């Protein structure tokens, strides 16, 4: 009997030493998952360093390829559609050198190349050679002083070319197209040297006329005498 009691006491002690099972709630389970899993924060997309008015600007699609992270490009029209007209900026005139510098911005369309159209008088315009799609600036040389011109920039791709408003007018003098668009009218002023020569010529002519008037005055005076002196002489004789 004593031995059986000892066995029961030993069994009770062994049972008490065994760890009791722990009941986990759903919240405890979720906290454990949060400790093990690292949440990745998504990186914010940035715009590509693309300026459609920048000279020698590569396409935005090329910038996406070479960038360390993906960047965003402005929306463009489809490649199977003709491009929208570019926007021609101010024309910087160099009157003394006889040329002008033009600058434009690319349209929101795929462009393979540009070219310039220059109207000087009635008839067909002068067409430049094709310009690379990265070009945004060009020089117009050989312009004549005092002449009005109409300049248009045209964008082209495989689907066609952009429209040129007002291209069918008769001469730059009658052109009344919009100033904010692909075309612009400008007038080459006379060269500063020409103005100096004209001023010198006018001054010389005035000086010669003044000298001629003085000579003519003295010649008449010597021939007919001074009217004031003749009147004084007649008055003294009468006295």
From Swiss-Prot:
Domain Fibronectin type-III, residue spans: 82-179
Which Gene Ontology cellular component annotation is one that this UniProt entry carries?
membrane
* UniProt keyword terms in alphabetical order: Glycoprotein, Membrane, Signal, Transmembrane, Transmembrane helix
Membrane topology field: Single-pass type I membrane protein
Q: Where is the signal peptide?
A: 1-19
* Residues with attached carbohydrate: 132, 174
* PROSITE patterns linked to this entry: FN3
Q: Where are the transmembrane segments?
A: 195-215
Q: Does the keyword Cell inner membrane apply?
A: no
Q: Which InterPro entries does the UniProt entry name for this protein? A: FN3_dom (IPR003961), FN3_sf (IPR036116), Ig-like_fold (IPR013783)
By what name is this protein known?
LRRN4 C-terminal-like protein
